[in-house]
Amino acid sequence: MMKNKEIIERIKSKKAFISDMDGVIYHGNKLLPGVPEFVEWLKKEGKKFLFLTNSSERTPRELQEKMSRLGIDLEENVFYTSALATAHFLAAQRPGGTAYIIGEAGLINAMYNAGYTMNNYNPDYVVVGDTRSYSFEKIEQAVNLVLKGAKLIGTNPDLTGPVENGIIPATKALISPIELATGRQAYFVGKPNPPDDADCPQADRLFQ
């Protein structure tokens, strides 16, 4: 069995690092202990690194700004979200497609930038991500669109997400009523699904 010192030295020898964010880098709006020192070490040692999040709410720019508010300055291209993974996956499946989206700016912007058009009438996909603006009307519309043939996609399979005062319902919890009402199972793109399902150009650039 390796001792702690051996484990630390083995970690230090790595050239690149990929880290989760929610519950690893921060919890809500609080950095977790050791994070500033870890990020500073990554920069000082010239390590390549990428921060991944299954949350689809924020854009990479918004994540960059959040980290800056918490006292850590990073480049925008070190963040990769489940919204980006979903957009890249769907763009590969059906380039220039259409989607009805239940989600926040992070998901809407990612889909738009991937060449998708928003469509509330006869979309190729109904895409559900993390959101705080959930409503019965949106569920009703999503249900009817799926019954008409739209494929149901979730940005991640998480039931809940951590916040400072507890947890919040995440994508799998939000998409469940649509699955139950339609009898259709959603396809989820984010972790822990295989990385082949979603291209990650940020990783390609950083780790080449």
Regions from the PLM with identified roles:
Residues 1-21, 25-208:
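HAD-like aspartate-dependent phosphatase fold
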